[in-house]
């Protein structure tokens, strides 16, 4: 089940919210857990056993780590056992096929018989719920959060359906108080609805339209320079609007239930360095990698060379987290290399002024990286890079011109104008969120006033949301890109 589907919008969500607000406070976490398992089982019922098993395992390990004491040797042994089993589960389901295929390629080159392995199906969301479980037991070990004895709350944290499939990557220590006591207000619910609709519009109106352009350009066997750059730019925008759209919808759903999740994007394409980019892109993952991998490797505490090595390894493993493919490994290495270079050069990664040259160079590095991230294999990536940097024919090929529509071109232009407007607005506000406000305000004399700008903005969002639903009914199924990770 996906958020941008009729089943979710018109069946699952209304029934869940109705039951949620009709039930008492003490039963809401249990209802959330049951609903989240139903949501997950809509994909495959049989993987619920794995999901529940991982949850119970980390709940038990958390208790053992907590009982052993903060940062003690016994606690460390329990922690290593817990993390080891978690990574073994993730490694089997996510990397077994890749590992066997790579090994077989080597063996057959020497004339040896290949291994035979039944194809291992990747459970949806496993990368996210494994990482969240690992962060919990590490936080218990570090003393950042006590081990919970409330199995319902912990299981609901792991399973909570708004973020279950594609993040944000949540942490128990940030949400434990909200599970125990969260507020439900009309303002928060209204904010959640607006945020959900914004994400839905991003996904259906922009990302799904640009997906057709990107898919066609990457599929061309002999792309021109124009084809390759069009595909790269279309995918760059598609990925942002798709993934940030999902995050907006997840955050909005959380608000409807009284939760406030962390922000996952802060206008990343306005960045003037790769370091700044990773403070703005997929924030929940980048901070997870920093806190639980980079720091564990030693961070910047063990000399200059080790700092560069740790930056590189963190991003290399971050690339591998995205999938079992050499393309993701190279993408991670690409970003790790530039993070290390920027640290070595001592670049200003907190700019107070907008520098077009720094921005353009950073954006170019990001776009170049997205090409190999999107490519199915190294051959496709090489084909795209060869066309992009041959600087040959900037005209679109006949195949591309025949497929490209005016709506797709207009959507691409609108996407980048939107990115530029909100990115520059965010930069000149020093990345501070706008003060919370509501369309309806009570004046000093007790009269009711309306902020017509906000009223019209929300009316436009509602109109576009309805139009997006109509568009959704006319197009084929289009899952979120990060479902595959």
Swiss-Prot record:
Gene Ontology CC: one annotated term: plasma membrane
Any one GO molecular function term: acyltransferase activity
Transmembrane spans: 7-24, 39-61, 78-100, 115-137, 150-172, 312-334, 360-382, 402-424, 461-483
A Pfam cross-reference name: MBOAT
InterPro entries in alphabetical order: Ac/AlaTfrase_AlgI/DltB (IPR024194), AlgI (IPR028362), MB_O-acyltransferase (IPR051085), MBOAT_fam (IPR004299)
EC number: 2.3.1.-
Keyword check for Cell membrane: yes
Source species, domain of life: Bacteria
Alphabetical keyword list: Acyltransferase, Alginate biosynthesis, Cell inner membrane, Cell membrane, Membrane, Transferase, Transmembrane, Transmembrane helix
GO biological process: alginic acid biosynthetic process
Primary subcellular site in the record, as a coarse category: membrane
Pathway: Glycan biosynthesis; alginate biosynthesis
Enzyme active site: 322
Localization per Swiss-Prot or TrEMBL: Cell inner membrane
Function, as annotated: Together with AlgJ and AlgF, forms an inner membrane complex which probably interacts with the alginate polymerization-transport complex and adds acetyl groups at the O-2 and O-3 positions of mannuronate residues. Acetylation of alginate is important for the architecture of biofilms and increases the ability of alginate to act as a defense barrier.
Family label: Belongs to the membrane-bound acyltransferase family.
Name by which UniProt lists this protein: Probable alginate O-acetylase AlgI
Organism: Pseudomonas putida (strain ATCC 47054 / DSM 6125 / CFBP 8728 / NCIMB 11950 / KT2440)
């Amino acid at each position: 089940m996906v958020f941008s589907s009729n089943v979710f919008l018109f069946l699952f969500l209304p029934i869940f919210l109705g039951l949620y607000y009709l039930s008492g406070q003490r039963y809401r976490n249990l209802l959330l857990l049951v609903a989240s398992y139903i949501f997950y089982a809509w994909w495959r019922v049989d993987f619920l056993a794995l999901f529940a098993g991982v949850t119970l395992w980390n709940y038990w390990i958390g208790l053992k780590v907590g009982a052993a004491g903060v940062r003690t040797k016994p606690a460390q042994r329990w922690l290593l056992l817990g993390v080891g089993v978690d990574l073994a589960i993730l490694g089997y389901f996510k990397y077994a096929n890749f590992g066997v295929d790579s090994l077989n390629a080597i063996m057959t080159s020497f004339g040896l018989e290949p291994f035979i392995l039944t194809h291992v199906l990747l459970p949806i969301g496993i990368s996210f719920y494994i990482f969240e479980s690992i962060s919990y037991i590490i936080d218990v070990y570090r003393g950042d959060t006590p081990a919970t004895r409330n199995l319902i709350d912990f299981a609901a944290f792991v399973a909570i359906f708004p973020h279950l499939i594609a993040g944000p990557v949540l942490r128990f220590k940030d949400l434990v108080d909200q599970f125990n006591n969260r507020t439900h207000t009309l303002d928060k619910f209204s904010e959640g609805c607006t945020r959900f609709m914004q994400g839905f519009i991003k996904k259906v109106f922009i990302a799904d339209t640009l997906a057709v352009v990107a898919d066609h350009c990457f599929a061309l066997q002999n792309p021109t320079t124009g084809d390759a750059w069009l595909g790269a730019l279309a995918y760059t925008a598609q990925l942002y609007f798709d993934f940030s759209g999902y995050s907006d919808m997840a955050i909005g759903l959380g608000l409807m239930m009284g939760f406030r999740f962390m922000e996952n994007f802060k206008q990343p394409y306005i960045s003037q360095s790769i370091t700044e980019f990773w403070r703005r892109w997929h924030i929940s993952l980048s901070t997870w990698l920093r806190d639980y991998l980079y720091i564990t490797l030693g961070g910047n505490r063990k000399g200059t060379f080790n700092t560069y090595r740790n930056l590189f390894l963190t991003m290399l493993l971050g690339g591998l987290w995205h999938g079992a493919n050499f393309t993701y490994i190279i993408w991670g290495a690409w970003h790790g290399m530039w993070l290390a270079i920027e640290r070595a050069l001592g670049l200003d990664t907190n700019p107070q002024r907008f520098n077009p040259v720094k921005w353009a160079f950073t954006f170019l590095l990001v776009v170049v990286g997205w090409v190999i991230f999107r490519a199915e294999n190294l051959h496709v990536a090489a084909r795209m890079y060869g066309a992009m940097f041959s600087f040959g024919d900037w005209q679109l090929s006949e195949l591309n011109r025949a497929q490209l529509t005016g709506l797709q071109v207009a959507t691409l232009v609108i996407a980048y104008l939107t990115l530029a407007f909100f990115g520059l607005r965010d930069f000149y506000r020093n990345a501070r969120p706008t003060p919370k406000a509501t369309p309806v305000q009570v004046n000093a004399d007790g009269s009711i006033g309306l902020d017509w700008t906000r009223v019209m903005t929300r009316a436009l969002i509602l109109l576009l949301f309805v139009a997006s639903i109509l568009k959704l009914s006319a197009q084929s199924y289009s899952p979120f890109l990060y479902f595959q990770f």
